[in-house]
Every structure is written in C-alpha cells, then in structure tokens.
C-alpha cells in the first residue's frame, strides 16, 4: 500500500523527454567575434524556437536528440550562417552527459557540452513559454501570474538523469511578490516612493531618475532611434514591443548588476551612479515595500514636540513665515491696483537680496532642486541631518500641459499654510529673508510707494506677482521654472528700463539673520569692496556670483527658464537680478547704488566670506570641495576683464559673454517683453543658439580643460555673442515644455501637483524619501556633449537612447553625458542621420545579463526611510551615556554600532523564543490598492497551472509521481542467468501477459521521445511510454528503507522523583500531572516593566502574582520580587517595590518618549543596586539572575528594537558601575497575550493553566544555569529520549560506520545563514536531544578596519572572524555534550547546515581551513531550504466526522493500514489493560487511573457520569470513529507529529544548484489539511508538506542511505523541540495559526530559529557614525 500511496503523490518534476543519445556540434566564429556569436544565438532561437543552442565558453553549442537526427530535423547552421565554422561534433549516449567526468571518454569537450546542454534546454523552455505568453522572463528564471497584475518568481531548471529522462523542476520562490508596472501608472494605486523597479528580462534593479515622482520619468514617443533595442527585446523575450510604448527613465543599480543586494534595512536608497537608460514601462516589474503606519495620533506629535527647543523655534519661524506671506500678498495686491508703466525684469535671476522670495513662477512639472537642501546624488541617506517635512511642497510635481495662468490661479487658491512645512529648508538654509525682518521693516515695506520698478503691464504683472506670491514661502524653486520661461522669452528680451528705475527705490536696512546659513554668504556678495575680509592668499572678492536668488541653487538657473513678471520680494528692488547682472559686466555698476545695500553678515562669522566659487555652494560637495580659482589669478593682476564675464553656473559650464553693448540691445527689445511671456515661442531662437552650451564632463581633467577654453572664448567673444544669447547663456533644452519641432512628448498628465504627490506626506515613513533619488529630478531628456558637437540642440533630445548616460559631476546640474565610447558612436552616427542618432550597444548587458533571483529580498520595510539622523530630543538632564533611543522618531528600526553585540544578545532570544507571537512575516503593510490586488490573487502558483502551461507548449509532458523517484533502476538493469535463459518467453507471451518489472523497464528504456519536436513518431512513443510507466508503477514495490515513517519522539520528565519517558503531548498537561524538570530547579528575581495610565496598574500586579504562583506550582523553582530602597542623600532615585517598574504614559504621548523614560528608570535601578551593595542592605540577591519582564503595548515592528536598546543600556550601565555579578536575562511579551485593552481601560485576561504553564516553561528555559558555573548552555525543562541502540557495538572489532553509527557518537547540528545583503549572520546549535541549544547573530562586513575592531570590540566582524567564532562555540558545546554523555570512544560529527543556499566560496574556504585544522571533528555538510513545499495528491480525504486535534490511535489506524504498516506503532506496553471496560468510567469515583498514560487517554468528559460504549477486545472502540471510548492500550498522539521519510534512489540536484547532483537527497513529508474549503467540497485531495534535505559532503566511510535516514530521524526530534523551546504559538492565543505556522511544523527548530531571527534583523539599519 505504500507504493500505491507514493504513486499518487505529485512532485515538482515534469518529464519532457526520454532520450537514448545526444549529438552535439561546437561552432566558433570565423572572424573571432565572440559578441557576434552571442547575438547570433538570439537570432537562431528566434528563428527556430525549438532549437537547442547556447553560447558558452566562446563557442556556440548545438544539440540534437539521437532519435530526431534520423528524421533529418537537424539544421546545418554553417549553411544558414556562413560566419560560423565547425570546431567539433560528436554523438554520445545519454548516460555520459550527467557525469561526464566518470565517462570512459577523456574528452574535455564533453564536460563543456554537458553543462551547455542544460543551459540550452533551459533557454529554449523559457523562451517558448514566454513566446506563448504564459510567463515573463525575469533574471535567471521567470515570473508567472498569480492574480491581477501580481506575479511570483517561478524557478525552472532542467535535469537530465542517467536513465535518459529529461525532466524540468518547477518551484516557486516563496514570499516574493512582484507587481505589474501598470499598478503604479496608469492605475496609480500606490505613491511613487514605496517600490523598487526590476527590468524584464534581465531582472536588474533600477532607480527612478527623478525619485520625487514617477510621472516625471515617463516619456511617450521619445525622438530616439529605438528600433534596435525593441528588436533585441523581441528576439530575446519573444514579446513584440510597440514603438509608441511608454518609456521610463531609469538608473541601473550597478551593485545588483554584479549580483549583490543593497542593504535591506534601507532598500530604497540613493545611488552614486549617474548613468540612465530609457526602458519600456511595460517591461518593468515593481516590488512594493511594506509600510507600517505610525500608531501615534496627531495630537501625540504635537505634545512631544513641545519638549524639544528646536521644535519651538520651528513653530515660531512657521508663524513668522505665514505672517510675512500675508503681508506680502497685501503689498502685491496694492501694487496690482496701482499698476502703471511696464517695467521689465530680467529673465535670468531673482532678487539677489531676497532670501525667500524669488521671481520664479510655479510652472508645470516642477522638479525641485535637491541641492538647495544640501542633498546630492552621492549624499548617502544617513547624512541627512534634518527631518525635512515639506516633501509635498518641496518636491512638487505639477501637470505638464497645464496652462501657466491655470497653475498660477491654482497656486493662489491653495491654503497659505502649505508653506509652513518648509520651515527646515527656509530656516536652515537661508530661508525667506522676510523671516528676519522685524515689524518695523514690514511696516516700511507696506508704506513704500509703488514705482515703475514695481509694476508690469497687463497680464505680465498679474503673472509676475502671482508667481512671486506662489514662491514667497518656498526656498527651493524648480529647475524647470527657468527652462520653461527661457522657452517663452526670445533671447533679446531683457529690458534696460529696469536699471535707471532702481534709484527710485532704496531698500530698508535689515538686521542680520539669527539663523542665516552660509548658503547666501558664500555665493552672494552684498558689498563688492568689503573691508571686513582681507586675505592675501584668497582670490580677490571683486566679482560676486549674483545670478540667482539666495534660495535658488544656481543649477536651477542653469537648467530651467526664468519666470516672467515683476519681482517685488521681501527686500524690494526694481530689478535686483538685472542690477547685479549688469554690475557683473561693469555696464551699470554704480557705487551709490551699491552703498544702499544693507550689510548683512553670517551668523557663523563676524566677517563676510566671499571666495570666488566655480559654482554655487552645493557644487563643492559634488566636486569634492573644489573652489574654482582662475589659474592666472596669482600672476595676472588684471582680474576685472578676465572675470567680468559671469562664471560657469550653467549646465554647460560655459562662461556667459556680456558687454556694455547689451544696454542698447536690451532697450530695443523692451517692447517684446509682453509677447515673450506667453508660451507661443517655446521653440524660439534661444534653442538654436545653444548648440555650444554642451560640454563633456566625463572626468575632472576634461572638465578643467573645458573650463579654461571656455574662459578664453568668453573673453574673446563677449561683444559678438551678446546679441545671440539670453542674459544667461543657458541650456534651454527644456524637458518639461519641449520645442515644437521635437516629437518628445512626456506623459500627458492633467493632475495637479498635489495629486501627483498624493500620499507622500500622509505617511510618517515617507517624510524624506524624496532626497534618496540620487540623480536629479525631472531631467528626462538632457545630456551634454562638447561645444564642438555637430548636433543642433533640438536634435539632442533624440539621442536619449536606451544606453548609459552619465550625468555631470556637478551635483546641482542634472545634465547627463554619455561615456566617451558612447559619445564617439553618437558622433559617427550623426553624420549618417542628421535627424536621428542611432543607438549604442551599451544596453546589451541590461538584456542578456541574467540576475540571480536569490538576490531579490522576499520583502522590505519602509520604516527606515525618513532619516538615520533625526533631531534629538534635548532634555535638561541629558545622560552622559551614549543613547540611540532618540534617533527614532516614529517606527524606524535603527541602532548604533556601539555595543551592538550586547544588543543582539538580548534581541536573539526574544525574537526566536516568542511563544509564536511574532507576526512580522504575516503582516502585509502594502499601501493603498495593492492590498486589493493581493486579496484577489492566488496564494501561489498551482501545479495544475504549471502543467497546463507546459502542456500547451510541449504537448508530450506529464507530471512525475513520487514513486518514479523511488525506482532502483540499477537493480532493474541487472540481469541474472535465469532471466537470460527465459528471454524466449518475451517472444511467446503477449505484452499484456508478461508484466515483469525488468521486462517493463527494458521496454521503457527502448522508447525515445521528446516534447520539442512535434512529429507522429514522438507522439506514438510518448503514449507507449506512459502506458508502460503506469504498469511499472503498479507492479513495482517500494522498499521500507526508502519510504518509511519516522518513530515517535518521547521526552524525559520527573514524576515523584522518578524519570518517566513520555510523548510530547503529555507536556501539555504538565501542571495537572505534577511533573518536574529532570534538571534542577531555577530560582531568579523578577522586575516587571509595564506602562500605566491613570488607574491601570493593577493588571501588572495581578499578573506578577499569578506567574510567580504558577512557576512554583510547576516545580520549576521560585521567583522573588525585587525590592530596593534609596537613601536620603539620593532622593532623586525612586525606590523599587514589589518587583514593578511602572512608567506613566499618556494616550497622546509617543512611545519613543515612553522608552526614554523607561531607560532612565532602569539606569536609576543600576544605581539602586550599587547603593544596596555599598550599604550592605542585602535587598538585592546577587546569587540569583535578574529577569527584566517587559510588557509591550506597542504593536510596531520596531518595538523589539527599542526595548532591546533599553536592555542593552542597562547591561552597559551595570558594567560601567562595576556590577559584573548581576546576571540578567530578559523577556518581551506582547500585551495582547496578557491584557485586554478597551479604549483607555486595561484589564488582565483570564488565564488558563496551560497558558501560564507555557510562559513558565519559557522563563525556565531562558533562565541561566547556576551562576557559579557559567555556561552558554541553558538547561531546558525536558529533553528528548535517546533512541536505544539497534545493535551491540564491539570496540575491539574494526567495524565501520557504513551500516550504522556508534551509540557513543556525538552529533551536533549547526545551521547558519547569511543575509542576501551580506550584512547579517545568524547561527544556531542543537544536538538532537536538546541537551545544548544556542543561538548567536553577528553584524557582518566584508572588510573591517583595525580601528573598527578595536573600537567596537567585536560589534562588527568579517566572515573569517565569524567562522572562527562559530567553530569555537561548536568546540565548547562538544565538551558539554561529552560531559553529559560521559563517553570517550565515540566520534564527533558536526552537521553543518547551510540554509537557502549551497556554501559559497567565501565561506567554504574557511570551513575547509577549520576542518583541516581540527581533525577530531568530522564535517557533514547539508543544504536545506527555510520553508517546505506543498505538493498535492490524487487521493481524496476521508470526509468523516471532524475530530479534535488530538485523537486516540484507532482514529489513525486506517491511515496506518493505508501506508502499509502491519503492526500498530502507538500501543503502550507499560499500561495495564482494564477488564472492567466502560462500566468503570460512569463516574469519577469508579475511574481507576494507574498511569499518566491512562489519564491522557481518558475522555474529555470522564469526570461526568454518562454512559460510554465499552471498547472491544481488539482494543478499538466499537463505537463510531470519533467516539470517546477508552482502551489502556491506546496512546494519545497528535496527528501533526506524523512525519514520513522518503529517500529517492535517483540522484537529484540541489534546489539552488541545479547543475550539480547531491550525494544524497531526502524528503520529510507531513500531511496537512487545507483550511476553509473542506466544508464546501465533497472530494478534497490530500496535501503534503515536503521538506527537502540535500547531503553535499561527508566522510567516505558512511553509507549514504544510512546517514540520510539518521539525519532525518534527528530532524524529527528537533521538530519536536519547536514546542519545547516555546517557538510554536500557544493554542487559541495567536492570530497567526495559519499557513505560515502550519508550514513551519515540519521544519527543525534550529532552522526555524535562523530564519525567524534573520528575517527580522535584515530590516534593522545599523548607524556606523
């Protein structure tokens, strides 16, 4: 019956062919062009989809099956492609391909061909499935749909067995969900910052070029010659891409390009790479981060911020900003009423003296300049020192096609308080100068008379005032603002009339700003001849850099058009930008006017600091602090003429030619101003004249040379070029409003800017994510080339092909430049096609590079995306102890590197041994409508879907059953003499009559077929093969050594002073049966930490009393409460009474403040302990460990991080106060387990004895052993019973381990895993019996400096130090086990288990080093997955009456008979049968219980008199199944504990190394019931959990079958340890008793522990500063 069961269980394997021989041909390129071979492979596969061809080792391999070669189906590639030449050809039997090194032929070509064959088969399968639309190619595998726009990663690997079977393994990557790009646009179900992008088909991760808004990166119909890219995508994926598709501007992640994963703790981050590509938006997949909303209420933050002085200042500044904005609006309205003459204002700059207001309008598609807040493309996330709240206003994304007037009107109607969130920017970086004006100044501004300088005519004045009004409170204007109006204005549109009118207005004297950052002072000179600063070593401050407003980075000026209209500003001036512009050219500089300027000095220096800077202040960060100084400044004294021309602040870095002749030309063009403000001249003359504004800044040397040449050209051509240029010689190639002759068409978005940034500021977790986007926002189609480029500027947009483009090194200028090689290609191609620029092949790696999908995390959180450096919470009594609790504002998971080792020591046990209450993996915090997509999606990729998809493309495909893996083909191939003599019977008898297994196998082997060539012979052979296989499955029997049930696990307990062996179900009745631990009792002190509000402290006292009483009744020991008093001299210390530390928390108080208060109380506790020691009051028991029991009411994921920080600080304080004798252990329990909270009232739940006993068991396990003999091992309350020896070992006999291991051998299991971002390392140790259990984690780095090693004392370690530490711990644990067993003759085996991967080389080299050094320890290397797979079966469930979880054995006997076990395994030989039958159980008094086993088997209602049906003599109740009959021979057993072992006879590859066969593979199987559907279906199919174990290496004296069976038996024991170690959920107390906990029921505890802890640690960001 076992065979019948195995023949119905499905596997992940699907058979595609049965082969006899394979012919292969190796081709090389005639002209040694390896890249041509690579491209030729794609062409061949596209032309013949079913062909088996691949490029490998600089050759092209072509394979043909032997049975197809006779059919003339081979293709002569040399005739089709003359550039190919044949290198080698051969035909080999199929049994030589899987193991070419063991073949008789000593042929190197065969070794390469065997690897190439699997690659060619995999590519062919994936390509055909993609061609059919079933899957999408993704990385080294593919993705398959599981719902509407939801995909899961499907790993497809072909395998060739030695018997000729070609099968394909199809396994879903668990817990990884990807979404279609249509979810973000056009469906707009989530905001723009909570996802990462992966390319199809390569799987490379990319970043948005403009991270502030997805829509700024989308382009429709770009003017590029993208045919080559689309054609390459078509022949690679089989998917036709339309040229009119939507394109997106992306930056590839170079780290992921090298198969490395970014830090998961801050997975959405900035990148230093400044190269971008254009990619079809349809060929992108999104992975959304999990967002955890902040639990604080609105009033909560307001209350907490009042305690911070900086917040008080911020509130005050916000008030001043709003007040000054109102005054400014009143002044503007007055100016509009008195509007008279038209006065033109410069297009190039805002007010020089205004700090907040500027002359730039709110134009469509605004992309704020990140540099204005000190962020740059290379600025890492942790360097953002300020929590900038104003993401919505600071990075505003307006509609592209909205009219300017509509935008202005919309801006006017917006609430004025929108600018209040700009506090940090304005105040920390210069802000609005009106903030610094006092009331007198404001009154003076209101009383001033309007002059022609203040007014414009008609629509221009309205627009100008509105634009000024819109940005009066915003310190960061957009780059696109300048570009847009540069398109609007013709080049000669600046009026001269503004200059003489400036005398009519004299600005008021303003007092210095108290928060005036260096931004203004370093780039804008208030007084040319400054007497305050004289430094002979510095360049002379004769020429300021007064191009733009102090709040506008000069990159914004250089890349964006100026606004139009008047610029009243807080410090009014007629045309301040024009004034300084002409001063710079010495055309209208007047000392009298200059003397009118107020002298403002920086708050940081009493003198004015006026260096000559190459660009604005932010450039110094991008260029490494390079301050531009002319090379001839030290030798040539004539600096006026050399430096009169404005320096390089434009994108191109070109100097702007300007001369005195500008005056006349500007006067002549005064009348043009009105018409130029419209958008009708978008394709104006300025575009045509800006061809030379581009330069290549690929490296610093070229950049400096270009700057020298530009200076010379600027000096020579000042006069001649002025008429052809705008006042600023800008790169006016605007991507927001393109020239009319260009076909560049961004996505037509009509939403307002507020809708574009819909929910960015609504979530706490996204307050600062906009700064992470690296290259600058909204520069979609611009890059620079050298001035001698032959391209016109309107043609440059067409050159944005899907290749790498490099941006400028200047971080405020978002121009992009191609690499040198790319530039040469562009120049060459431009000669051939002046209208379009052909593509480069630089994007080939983005298509052909297959990224390993294992580098993609299953999930990542958005918690840490605010900033790693937040405003600290200052208090008057700030502790000297370094504390990182204040760097957390909301729900960030950030910890400092200092004392990280202690932090992890507290974190590990609280995460792992959590009573199953951790729900991090079960919580999906997706944003907005993504949750709806998940609800409509399937839980995974079903086997039926896989079979249907394969069958549509490859009709001759069928799923393999488990029994096919259990065939011993070697035994079937052996023929004895009797079989050879009776061969004539095969000819006499019919096929149906003779069904011997060997004869059937011979017939099976003779049939050759495949699913790739659809001819009649293949179909006929396939049908015959299936019929023979069905007969063979029915005829062949399975050995019990290959398919068996693992024995029951029993535990050791103490009952009345005697050791009793009991199955683990008896542990659930620990208190009822008065059991005791085998080890000695553990006593400790307890300190319960809880929050209180009003009168809610009673629950803590009640729970503490209950747990102390239960712990004692369970015979675990005694718990004493901590009571500490203070002394009169330390009245600041609060005494501790009754073991309680109650921290008051108001409902509007943040948990961060609560944690800080708790931390202070525990630090005070340390001082109380020290006072108790000094005063010798002996209230504190130093001989007992101290338990810190924390009741956690915070449901956020970061609560464990924060609480463990408190524990770490307490431990560090004990060391600081020289109290090493205090041994502490901790426990964090969620409040949901203990209390019920309704509104503001908190009450203790009613506990069952079972729940309290589980908590007591957990505390006993965690309590350290005797303090006198400290050890890393902590005794458990019970251990597993060791299996009795199967045979007697005689040591004087030379017996080997091939058949069995010695009873004295010591096995220690070590499971470990390293996170995919290589930042965390977790290991756990366990022996099979639970005598030693240990877990440890490390923060890992590939390279650790000597200073870090000495400073952080092992807080950060490299892989070599970690492996040494692991080996040292393993050696210590072997010593403990050796002392426990008292054996000296056995060997030591370390079962090294690598989770989720084979051992990589960087780890393998250290394990080899350590194992060769320590010969006494023998390594057994195993590879496993963290999670099991779910497989189906053709069997139907027995839909009988539902039974309880724990049923007597008679309920299971049908199952045992089904599996073919002749004798029951659950009968007890210790219990005595009762002859009185059911009459004895009619009342409690008549029930005789002679053993605990009988008590467990008593019915649930045995205490109530009622009639029961007596059991029959056979021991099985005569009642219906499910009735509560009693039989002393029946043992209570949990059905979930039934685990079966399967050892396939066929060698199989590892799940993560498909080309390498394991030494042995084994499967643990457990039947599970799928929930929720059983009530509605009549025919429920059985489902099994399958856990795969791969044996990779061991000593050669082992019998592999015996060793695998031994490992599986030990795994079964360690599965039972999950419950003993309190890792499983408490029944009825957890809301996650779903799929996740059910699936982990078959995983051993040490593997569960590693995965559980690592899944949490990867989301923690470590601050190394």
Curated annotation (Swiss-Prot):
Localization, UniProt: Nucleus
InterPro entries named among the record's database cross-references: Med13_C, Mediator_complx_sub13, Mediator_Med13_N, MID_MedPIWI
Keyword Transcription in annotation: yes
Entry keywords, A to Z: Activator, Nucleus, Repressor, Transcription, Transcription regulation
UniProt GO cellular component terms: mediator complex
GO molecular function: transcription coactivator activity
Family per record: Belongs to the Mediator complex subunit 13 family.
Functional description taken from the UniProt entry: Component of the SRB8-11 complex. The SRB8-11 complex is a regulatory module of the Mediator complex which is itself involved in regulation of basal and activated RNA polymerase II-dependent transcription. The SRB8-11 complex may be involved in the transcriptional repression of a subset of genes regulated by Mediator. It may inhibit the association of the Mediator complex with RNA polymerase II to form the holoenzyme complex.
PANTHER family (alphabetical): MEDIATOR OF RNA POLYMERASE II TRANSCRIPTION SUBUNIT 13 (PTHR48249:SF3)
Protein name: Mediator of RNA polymerase II transcription subunit 13
Biological classification of the source: Eukaryota, Fungi, Dikarya, Ascomycota, Saccharomycotina
